[in-house]
Amino acid sequence: MTNKIYNHDTDVDIVHKYNAIGLKGWINQLQYIDKEIDKLLNLYAQSIQNKEIPARTLILFSKRKETNKRLYETVMKYSNIYSKAAECDDIQCNMAYLSEYERLRKSYQYHLTRYQKLKTICMITYFRVFDLD
């Protein structure tokens, strides 16, 4: 499926194309989060050795990294399957793809919200320890 929109595309075709673009964006964001968590884990590991922040911080980020990995794998798998959405020839087929996309979108948004909250709380703690505010 090409993501270019043509005049003859139906509304459903256009939605599928936008969703395919959205999936690519999610994949890129989840890859970025994975790299960011690695950097934060290294930073926090050093701080834990110096007893500057609680060890629980490392555990929380490790768990979030695992959650991120699972979601990334799920989105990748679905992204590969989603390319077949253009082959749908009835509303039930289209709705199946769109329903799964919406379910994944909610999981993705929930994950981002949880990650941002964790990062904010941990950064506030980190800055307080070093009195950097």
Where in this protein do the model-derived segments appear?
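Charge-rich amphipathic alpha-helical interaction elements
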Residues: 1-133
